[in-house]
Amino acid sequence: MKTDIEIAQECKLERIEKIAEKLNLTDDDYEVYGKYKAKIELSLLNKLKDKKDGKLVLVTAITPTPAGEGKSTVTIGLTQGLNKIGKNAVAALREPSLGPVFGIKGGACGGGYSQIVPMEDINLHFNGDFHAISSAHNLISACIDNHIKQGNELKIDINKIVFKRVLDMNDRALRDIVIGLGGSENGVVRQSSFQITVSSEIMAILCLSNSLMDLKEKIGNVIFAYDINDNPLRVKDLKIEGAACTLLKDAIKPNLVQTLENTPVIVHGGPFANIAHGCNSILATKMALKLSDYTITEAGFAADLGAEKFLDIKCRLAGLKPNCIVLVATIRALKHHGGASDINKEDIEALTKGFENLDKHIENMQKYNVPVVVAINKFVSDTDKEIECITKHCESKGIDISLCEVWAKGGEGAIELSHKVLKAASEESNYKPLYELEKSIKEKIETICKEIYSAGEVKFSNKALKMMKKIENMGFGNLPICISKTQKSISDNPALLNAPKGYTLNIDEIKLASGAGFIIAMAGGIIDMPGLPKIPVACNIDIDENGKIKGLF
């Protein structure tokens, strides 16, 4: 069996100019980055402002196993499938982070015959966006410490600096550090830490900005610390929002690539869904909607994380209205939630028990009044009996379900799913967010935890309660909520599989992302700098004398 990278390397890519032609782009609408990549100019949105938007389809998933359930693969396969049946469809995806690429998950460009290419480039650096985001973020960090060293005119309280440094890598050693050691010439000694770039507020801002000037304004509004009188200090107080924005002048432009079947894909931004808001950029999604009849996008991890944030944060802030939600499920993941000892062996009992997880995610998505279609991402270990079992279960609940073979067959494996998505997207979608912004921070958090996570009670630490009051007193109480929690469970406890309910969910800390425009609630001891596993994927990656990469996935 060929690996994903072997399949990708055998693909005949079309030059990016030809892909751009399929979108009716002119030479002035994009800038080429080599033969197979391009940046799309922001001016395109103004050029197409009078063009009607296409339909918006969100792809999400049930609670995954550590290896993931193929959400990106189905997103890409569905896009290829729609194009195969004559529809103009474009995928709008996130860019992979180097952290999981070298960590436990490997590359994040889909799999099998449903991938985006050039796969190696996209997984490794791509067009430099994440480096630009890291640089802009760390410029702010450097200026904060320099300001303190140079006299601290703003009277920054060094114990109340809330802006960390970032690195696009899993590195647990950087979670808690001391900086400024070695004498006064090296600055002021203080405790600090790093977070992974994809959890950075600058990443979130890039993905939630509508223009370059909007980006600059949002960066300026980031609260990086509090002064000795506990007043908030913003990046614009350091007068460096313009400098940070200049580092992002190209990164803000969405990237154009292609699938293995040479259909257009727009890739931009990459916030994680467990420790950030988990969606690609507003700009990329809006461009795709103008350039296609069907935009297929995804949100990270399961529906309780990425999809909830897509629907309650991104759609609300961008004025987007999804027409259909595709919920990806795998038989192996359902058996995992049902307590199977070996998910690669037929186990109807475990599969049936695992339906509780599937049903909970379906129920959650239906709360937003958007049509839902279930896609079963087929694995070779799935048996006919298991497929029949899950099909009957969904049909008994009146849910459209489709067996997807996009890994093995590419777009051909998503023909049935494509037709079901077209049908669902043609139905009336009365999308509405889960909660009203005017509710208190506590009420909004409790609504998500009880409605989406099925918690019986939400317990707030004293630190969290104090910060909630502070945020409301500062006038930010009407912002949407971004809960950071484990992706391994619907709850805040990774050990609670399937569909736990009635438990107590713990909110440890509350943070304000004043630039991005949301409030972060940290649940269940989640951390924003992952670590590497005992044997990271990096150990399997190599390159030969001709520059050919192997082992990426």
Curated annotation (Swiss-Prot):
Which EC number(s) does the record attach to this protein? Answer: 6.3.4.3
Q: From the record, give the cysteines joined by S-S bonds.
A: none
Gene3D superfamilies, per the entry: Domain 2, N(10)-formyltetrahydrofolate synthetase (3.30.1510.10), Formyltetrahydrofolate synthetase, domain 3 (3.10.410.10), P-loop containing nucleotide triphosphate hydrolases (3.40.50.300)
According to UniProt, the reaction catalysed is: (6S)-5,6,7,8-tetrahydrofolate + formate + ATP = (6R)-10-formyltetrahydrofolate + ADP + phosphate
Decide whether keyword DNA damage is in the record. Answer: no
Q: Name one GO molecular function term.
A: ATP binding
Q: Where does ATP bind?
A: 65-72
Report the enzyme's class at the first EC level: ligase
The UniProt keywords, alphabetically, are: ATP-binding, Ligase, Nucleotide-binding, One-carbon metabolism
Question: Could you tell me which InterPro entries the record lists for this protein?
Answer: Formate_THF_ligase, Formate_THF_ligase_CS, P-loop_NTPase
Biochemical pathway: One-carbon metabolism; tetrahydrofolate interconversion
Coiled-coil-forming residues are none
Name a biological process GO annotation.
tetrahydrofolate interconversion
Q: Name the family.
A: Belongs to the formate--tetrahydrofolate ligase family.
This chain belongs to the protein called Formate--tetrahydrofolate ligase
Q: Which organism is it from?
A: Brachyspira hyodysenteriae (strain ATCC 49526 / WA1)
